């Protein structure tokens, strides 16, 4: 069996690993359009801040190691078209320009997503950067130590934008974050959390300019200013982090796509064409808290999808179990994590929810290491089933969110969670874990 895998990031990499595990005798061809195999953009902040010294180490696997395991690895090589009826792909060598046709028995594509860029006046000025991929990582790193870069403007206040803002603030730059939304990280966290994080960022030389729309860039050859509908900001460097779009324009007319360009797949990762599977950021994914399909661009999601595509390669035997959309991030001294439904997602889905928020020290009063923690538990008011949670502290409590992710997947209720068994040791916790405490408050709220 000959299997072709497109994409060397999260989903593609995991598909290759699972192929080696379940189909060791398969002929595997692994294609990457770029010149570098398996770069992890989610590790870029560690490199920009100098915690990781070698940009080439920010990866899952080298092409050489995969070659030694029997995989035929092709970098600088683009699959430009699929001919599903013939079980063929058109392949272009981006160095030589030569094209060829490759046959396949099975095809797994993980085309990913590409960053949105603002189509506004001045967009062609120099020093307007993106934050995705190895080449941009190298360019951004150079700017962290460039003495001519003093004012950095980040457009977008999601995870990528906040990572960029923190990296440049730590490099001693004056940073402004602009977003059309009314608060930073508003897609991931509710207001009681983002209020605290906004104060933390402002205390670290970051200006938060939310509720503003960028209208144009200004400059002479290179960007010097950003103008919004409300203000103007000096800018020696602009980092655009306003989301992504699926890299699927080349698939129109070949595979069935949703109106937004995402690839239609079933619960076995199969596309509309036989023997063609799709995974990762260019697909929808089963979202357990709302029992629906949404697009959640997370590495963990793509990795699991890659594995399940291979499990179902020959027969549809393992339906994808779904995800809760769990994620986390550090913002200077604060660490937070979230899973499932928050207020923004509930409104988007039209789902009624109730919630309780607990703010307390996570250790006993006598423990000098105690730190304040914020925990919000979201549940269904009719069934009392757990739907989501958010957690934040200067202590790293983020792993606790994994318990809530499991609770959502297991369809646990607030009553189940209130008396769930968590260990107690004064150096690590309190007799009632903050998860228990929040669930108990929810039970009281429903009496």
UniProtKB/Swiss-Prot annotation:
InterPro entries: FAD-bd_OxRdtase, FAD/NAD-bd_sf, FAD/NAD-binding_dom, FAD/NAD-linked_Rdtase_dimer_sf, Pyr_nucl-diS_OxRdtase_dimer. This is NADH peroxidase. The active site is the redox-active Cys-42 oxidized to Cys-SOH. The oxidized form is stabilized by a hydrogen bond formation with His-10. Peroxidase whose active site is a redox-active cysteine-sulfenic acid. The modification Cysteine sulfenic acid (-SOH) is found at residue 42. It comes from the Bacteria. Belongs to the class-III pyridine nucleotide-disulfide oxidoreductase family. It comes from Enterococcus faecalis (strain ATCC 700802 / V583). Pfam families: Pyr_redox_2 (PF07992), Pyr_redox_dim (PF02852). Its cofactor is FAD. GO terms for molecular function: NADH peroxidase activity. The active site is at 10 (proton acceptor), 42 (redox-active). Coiled coil: none annotated. The lineage of its organism: Bacteria, Bacillati, Bacillota, Bacilli, Lactobacillales. Its EC number is 1.11.1.1. FAD binds at residues 7-11, 32, 42, 110-113, 132, 281, 299. Homotetramer. It catalyses: H2O2 + NADH + H(+) = NAD(+) + 2 H2O.
